[in-house]
Regions:
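Metal-dependent phosphoester/phosphodiester hydrolase catalytic core
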Residues: 1-265
């Protein structure tokens, strides 16, 4: 944990991050390398210590509800009426069941019938969504929700958990669901109609410091954007006048490389 603590401290000292803190409200949740080990999950022995470091780095108040439970999942809502937005930060690390290695070169891990999010986080999420009245709902988690054909970490490694997430969205008719993911060192936008006239987007952006520039192609039946391998970040803008979202993937110079417009449901 000493190395991780030092990296958090270094990040806080970077002029660009200081400028970001001065000009924006920062919300965050971890992925594996913030958590402590590559592809790590619930069996990681230092997860409680790592959680404290994360919350200290994010300046999460001591009286925040997330401080009272295991894991790092959080929720925030903004605005009201027809202009309400909710953000759900999902923890895909703290409770994740361990993978079983797969001998196939096409899939690194065997499919797992585990919960991925853990029982408590699932209960929290369903309770949150049962009273949700937001017009836009953003869900963020480290691993990709939709892309299923690549060999790395993804929700598709946990098919029952993925189905459960889709079922909860449709059960409560959650409006304009958009999932935000990273992890892959690439950027892409995926889209899936999970039932008739009900869809979800998965916006993947990663990363600002490392990217998989040598990757030429990768199967993803749900991809609706180019496969982008340069350093990148994502941006979402909301136009309430025409009830439309604009999602962009930008390169390290801030130049848009892909734009997707999404009608607010």
């Amino acid at each position: 944990m000493k190395d991780l603590s030092e990296k958090y401290a270094l990040q806080k000292q970077l002029p660009a991050y200081i400028k970001l803190e001065e000009n924006a409200t920062i919300f965050g949740v971890w992925d594996d390398h913030d958590f402590g080990e590559n592809d790590a999950g619930g069996s990681f022995s230092k997860k409680k210590e790592s959680r404290k470091l994360l919350f200290d780095f994010l300046d999460i108040p001591k009286n925040h509800p997330a401080q009272e439970r295991e894991g790092a999942y959080q929720s925030y809502c903004f605005g009201g009426g027809t202009q309400k937005v909710c953000l759900y930060l999902l923890d895909v690390r703290y409770f994740k069941e361990d993978y079983e290695k797969n001998s196939s070169p096409n899939q690194r891990y065997k499919k797992n019938n585990g919960l991925l999010l853990g029982a408590d986080q699932w209960s929290w999420l369903e309770k949150e969504l049962s009273t949700n009245d937001a017009t836009i709902n953003l869900f963020a988690g480290g691993i990709q929700l939709l892309s299923a054909e690549h060999p790395y970490e993804k929700w598709a490694n946990f098919p029952l958990a993925q189905k459960r997430f889709f079922d909860i969205l449709t059960k409560y008719s959650i409006q304009t669901p958009i999932y935000l993911s990273g992890d892959r060192h690439i950027a892409e936008v995926s889209y899936q109609e999970i039932k008739s006239n009900y869809w979800i987007y998965d916006i993947t952006s990663s990363g600002l410091t490392h990217s998989y520039e040598s990757l030429e192609d990768e199967p993803n039946q749900y991809r609706i954007s180019p496969l982008l391998t340069m350093l990148n970040f994502g941006k979402i803008e909301i136009n309430w006048e025409i009830f439309e979202l604009q999602v962009q993937i930008l390169d390290a110079d801030g130049i848009p490389q892909f734009t997707q417009k999404i009608s607010i449901q």
